[in-house]
From Swiss-Prot:
InterPro entries linked to this entry: Oxoglu/Fe-dep_dioxygenase_dom, PKHD_C, PKHD_hydroxylase, Pro_4_hyd_alph, Pro_4_hyd_alph_FE2OG_OXY
Nucleotidyltransferase is among the record's keywords: no
Segments forming domain Fe2OG dioxygenase: 78-178
Cofactor(s) required for function per UniProt: Fe(2+); L-ascorbate
Gene3D superfamilies registered for this protein in UniProt: q2cbj1_9rhob like domain (2.60.120.620), Rabenosyn, Rab binding domain (4.10.860.20)
GO terms of molecular function: 2-oxoglutarate-dependent dioxygenase activity; iron ion binding; L-ascorbic acid binding
Keyword field: Dioxygenase, Iron, Metal-binding, Oxidoreductase, Vitamin C
Residues binding Fe cation, per UniProt: H96, D98, H159
Protein name per its UniProtKB record: PKHD-type hydroxylase Mfla_2317
One protein family per Pfam: PKHD_C
EC category name: oxidoreductase
Length: 227
């Protein structure tokens, strides 16, 4: 399941974050690569744990916590602190799959990567290329979203970023461990939650069918969830 989540950050927040990031020091993006990714990766990255990365990352995590669409789609258990990359001058990221396990450097914090996310900090018209192309059971999807918008997709997906031939592409990328390991089960719960919300808006939260379906949702969540 691939989900676009609009306006995770406002345009004002994006501008403030870009001001901080544009003034920061960037390093070779391979500092966070696995062995496979290192062969395909050519970009720059904010150092993990840098003050700017922490500040903007905290803002992103706070915003995600207030996004009903994100919570419904991801059912997050743990979120890896957001990282940040920058592409320009022909830089690209070849086809790869994300590592199954991610550990935060110098800590015992680690997650199973069930879902991957990219949050855009550059407007589509400000750069050429830089298309995130994702391959999975839903087919091949090309993603290039407005600044402040985010895409969420299974970490098991093959994906790549096409060369940036004009301008600069800045984004945040991170992973999360969902309470629901299986993508098909997570998709079913997301669809069921959406139907409950739609019926509830039409009939009211006290409608017997809304109550019954809400019970079904929570019983499935109870059956499948890790916590």
């Amino acid at each position: 399941m691939l989900i676009e989540i609009p306006e995770v950050l406002t345009k004002e927040q994006v501008a403030q974050c870009r001001q901080l990031m544009d003034a920061a020091e960037w390093v070779d993006g391979n500092v966070t690569s696995g062995s496979q990714s290192a062969l395909a990766k050519n970009n720059m990255q904010l150092p993990e744990g840098s003050p700017v990365a922490r500040q903007v990352g905290d803002l992103i995590q706070d915003a995600l916590g207030m996004s009903p669409l994100f919570i419904s789609a991801a059912l997050p258990l743990k979120v890896f602190p957001p990282l940040f990359n920058r592409y320009e001058g022909g830089q690209a990221f070849g086809t790869h799959v994300d590592n199954a396990i991610r550990q935060l450097r110098g800590t015992n914090f680690r997650i199973r990567s069930d879902l991957s996310a990219t949050l855009f900090f550059s407007e589509p018209e400000d750069y050429d290329g830089g298309v995130l192309t994702i391959e999975d059971t839903f087919g091949i999807q090309e993603v290039k979203l407005p600044a402040g918008h985010m895409v969420l997709y299974p970490s098991s997906s093959l994906h790549h970023v096409t060369p940036v031939t004009r301008g600069v592409r800045v984004s945040s990328f991170f992973w999360m461990q969902s309470m629901i390991r299986d993508d098909a089960q997570r998709t079913l719960l997301f669809q069921l939650d959406g139907s409950i919300q739609a019926i509830g808006a039409e009939r009211g939260a006290g409608d017997p069918e809304v109550i019954r379906l809400t019970g079904v949702y929570h019983n499935l969540l109870r059956m499948w969830a890790d916590s």
